[in-house]
Amino acid sequence: MKPLVALVGRPNVGKSTLFNRITHQKSAIVDSTPGVTRDRHIMPAEWIGKEFLVMDTGGYCHDSDGISKAMLEQTLTAIGEADVIIFLVDVRSGLTYLDLDMAKLLKRDFNDKPVYFAVNKVESPQLAYEGESFRKTGFTEPWFISARDGSGVADLLDAVVDSFEEKSGQEEEDDSIRLAIIGRPNVGKSSFVNALLGTNRNIVSNKPGTTRDAIDTRFKRNGREIVLIDTAGLRKRARIDAGIEFYSSLRTERAIERCDVALVLIDAEQGLEKQDMKIIEMAAERKKGVLLLVNKWDLIEKDSKTSKLYSDRMYDDMGNLGWIPIQFISAMTKKNLYRAIDAALDIQEQRSQQITTSDLNRFLQDTLLQAPPSSKSGKELKIKYMTQIRAPWPVFAFFCNDPKLLQNNYKRFLEKRIRQNYNLSGVPFSLRFMQK
């Protein structure tokens, strides 16, 4: 698994700005108000050919309000889960008691992890001189950087990636299919895994996963080796509910990063909730296969029309994620558990298929004959041919006279046609339009 680098420090020292620079994102909210990054963000990053994950956290502080307590717990959780820590301070505001507390905490409780002490907002030689006072933290080799301008960040990242262990959880290169069991707390993830594997006689091995206390279980189904990434069973160390929720979310994000297909469990009695949608969207945005499993279906009073009505209601709520298949299961009665695994295997098979260019262009010509694109500003979009680009998920490239002439409704039309024609249910894919 990719190493995890956590950015920690008190509020408003520039963690989100550094996060955005490292990941080339603009997703984290950057504001001058202390503590504005209320939640965490995890994004993939790459430096000199080495891939890793970066986590942006809320600020470390001691205020008595609930948000600050939650942010403190999230910071401690992030430090515990991280492989490498970048500890940020602000040269302009000087050394504070919170900085000293964090330094003491890192040296006392997390001295087994690489910690890079970064003095941020150093935009002039004078500020670099003032930054020398930060050696009082006990970190005698500070890195002087400007996350805003980028100065010093490259040298810092060189050191960070050099610290990654050669075997820092790199996934074994094999042909196994990785399925992540994810969902909100108490939707039945543990019951699902126990019911699925409790009577399975083809288990190859159980071994500790790379996410600390998670268990990766290998088993075979119809001749295919499967790695089940289980995110159930939170550790009992979190001191407050917010910490438990944060830890759950962290494990979910890391499981999604590792998997081929995400099996998202929801509670049939509770229905599709906002947090369920966030988890589904997270998997879809990462271009993972997605299968929605409605657990505890045995508790629902039903007739022959119930599942259809239930599905229709969920698809209404899911909006443009209506391409995700739904299955009804019961971990308690073991109903449809292996059917769900088979569906996930089918999704991965479709996700990894490579369609020939000749087949794609026959499809394209038929599509253009039936429904050619409309003109825009008096100009006509002419799509010449298409091909599939090799990637972990399907990526289709269209070569045309001017990509700016493409209208959103026609792009959605092509997406729908491709999904139907190539049976991409549960499979996110990308369309790219290039000028030629």
Swiss-Prot record:
Q: Where does GTP 1 bind?
A: 9-16, 56-60, 120-123
Family membership, please give it. Answer: Belongs to the TRAFAC class TrmE-Era-EngA-EngB-Septin-like GTPase superfamily. EngA (Der) GTPase family.
Describe the location of the EngA-type G domain by residue ranges: 3-168, 177-352
Q: Which residues bind GTP 2?
A: 183-190, 230-234, 295-298
Q: What is this protein called?
A: GTPase Der
GTP-binding listed as a keyword: yes
What InterPro entries does the database record attribute to this sequence?
Answer: G_ENGA, GTP-bd, GTPase_Der, KH_dom-like, KH_dom-like_a/b, P-loop_NTPase, Small_GTP-bd
Task: Cite the source lineage.
Answer: Bacteria, Pseudomonadati, Chlorobiota, Chlorobiia, Chlorobiales
> Which PROSITE patterns does UniProt cross-reference here?
G_ENGA
